[in-house]
Structures are given as structure tokens and as C-alpha cells.
Amino acid sequence: NNISIKSEKKLPNVLSPDEIDKLIDFYNHDLFISSRNKTIIDFMYSTGCRVSELINVEESDIDIEEAFVRLEGKGSKQRIVPLGSKVLINLESYLPLRNKDRKSKNNKLFISKSYKNLDRTAVFRIIKSTGVKAGIHKELYPHILRHSAATHMLEGGCDLRTVQEFLGHSSVSTTQIYTKVTKAFLEEAFIES
């Protein structure tokens, strides 16, 4: 089981759990757009999904009762991802606002205020602008939520195989980049203590 890591790969940027909370908690569920943005950020972090997976999730892919979502990843590979209690609460608050006064038959979970599909650039804008408004002084993009989810899972003691399944990586060597991030985190924590 000799797995080598390509060392020229840049380590992914990661947000702290506090920064993740700042992003999610920036919004409330008072209005549709605010609720949608809050739920998008929480959903991306909680499921570790890619932008392409997020914009293609349909309402029928969510099972609130059983607390899971069906995601379609790269190469049309499907995976089932559990939904934690926090993201479930956000989904339960978002869905009635999403479906109120529905003027279209769009089945996508996350839609624009004109009931159209969200595209990748819209998601990039949401993440970037939320970071600025929430006072997070880092370059933000949707994939940072996926990187953060994987890193936090490993830091919390999750094994590499589970993280691999969670992210939908076909090879564990792809997932191993996060062990380097975690190692860097541990070294930094050790130096600071």
C-alpha cells in the first residue's frame, strides 16, 4: 500500500470552523434570497459538494426524514451524503420560502429569485460577497467550503476512506492532500502552544 503524494500540488486553502459559522450566520431566514444564501453555504460545507453538484441538486434528491441527499458527482457517479441537524434546520426553513408563490416548475433545490437555475458564477458571487460582508479577509470561492469540510473531518479524527467516500473521490490519493493540510495545522498548533 505504497501511496505517493505529488508534492508540487499546492495545499488547499481552508477556513476555520469560526469563519464557516460567520459565513453561515451572516444570513437569516427572513427573506428568500437571504435564506437561500445561508442554506447554500451551509449545504456546501455540510455535504462537501462541488459547485456542479450543488447547482444540479433537485428537491427530490433531499430526504429530510432520513437525513440524506443524493449527489451526482463527476462522471455521473451518484453518492449518498448524510445531512447534519444544522443543515436540516436550514433546509426546513428555506424550502417553504423557496416554494412560496411558485411561478415555475423548476425542480432544482437552489434557484434564482426569478425561478431560474443558478449557475456557477452566481454561486461564486454569493460565496465571495458573503465573505466580504462577514469580514473574512481571505480569498473566498465555493471549493474552499469543500476543502474546509474535508480538513475539519480529518482534524476531528475521521479516517481517510470515509472522507474519500464523503467527497466522492475515486482514488484515496486525491483525498490524501488533506492529510498534509491537517499535518500543517497540527505543526502550527504545536508551535503556538
Where are these regions (language model features)?
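Conserved catalytic core of the tyrosine transesterase superfamily
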Residues: 1-193
